[in-house]
A protein has these predicted regions:
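N-terminal regulatory/sensing modules of transcriptional regulators
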Residues: 1-126
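Hydrophobic packing within well-folded, soluble alpha/beta domains
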Residues: 3, 16, 50, 71, ...
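Conserved catalytic core of two-component sensor histidine kinases
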Residues: 107, 114, 136, 143, ...
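Hydrophobic "lid"/C-terminal helical patch
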Residues: 117, 146, 189
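Regulatory hinge/linker segments at domain boundaries
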Residues: 120-149, 154
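Recognition helix of helix-turn-helix DNA-binding domains
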Residues: 151-191
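C-terminal edge and immediately downstream basic/flexible tail or linker adjoining helix-turn-helix-like DNA-binding
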Residues: 194-199
Length: 199
């Protein structure tokens, strides 16, 4: 397999590239860290798989997801797989919707990653999972208020609801986001775009 890896974190990208090239199944894994270099390298050779980081903010005005369709326009036979530390359903859903053949968590072991890449090279494609139930406007208000550090009694008073009703809303938020506590729910709500982080 010939793989083109685009990740804006140099230490991670260079290490992963060297690691993958140690596997017999991979003949080359060329690493790039910025978008200009990426398009140049993509155009001069044929690649079996393009492995893209979702978050490319440091080196690109686009996210990895934004690049998927552009890659297929230039190299329709190349398969695009996403690599990310953000294993959020909304990102996974959008990436697969735009044509990515797989969405791989950065926490995967080298062995798991190579197995996934081998499966991709043989035509395997991930299916789009169902998206989480969306938070209601009220639920988004609540999780945002929780992030400010207000007590549950203060939040209930501001929203003119009982504390019992507030707890019901909070439990619904946890269930929808797959969160175990308020901090995890708040961080996931930010990652999914339901609320913006406090500055």
């Amino acid at each position: 397999m010939k793989i083109l890896l685009f990740d804006d974190h140099r230490i991670f990208g260079e290490s992963l590239s060297k690691l993958l090239e140690d596997w017999d199944a991979i003949s080359i894994c060329h690493y790039v860290s910025n978008e200009t270099e990426f398009w140049n390298i993509l155009s001069v050779d044929e690649w079996d798989i393009v492995l893209l980081d979702v978050n490319l903010r440091d080196q690109s005005k686009n996210s990895g997801i934004d690049l998927i369709e552009k890659i297929y326009n230039k190299k329709p036979k190349t398969k695009v797989a996403m690599l990310s530390s953000y294993d959020m359903p909304v990102y996974r859903q959008e990436a697969l919707k735009r044509g990515a053949v797989s969405y791989i968590d950065k926490s995967a072991s080298a062995d798991e990653l190579v197995k996934k890449l081998t499966a991709i090279s043989k035509g395997h494609k991930s299916t789009t999972p169902p998206l989480l139930d969306p938070l209601t406007y009220r639920e988004a208000e609540i999780i945002k208020a929780i992030g400010t550090g207000k007590t549950k009694h203060e939040i209930a008073q501001e929203l003119y609801i009982s504390v019992r009703t507030l707890y019901n809303h909070i439990q619904s938020i946890y269930d929808k986001l797959g969160a175990k506590n308020a901090i995890e729910a708040y961080n996931k709500a930010i990652a999914l775009g339901y609320i913006t982080p406090l500055i």
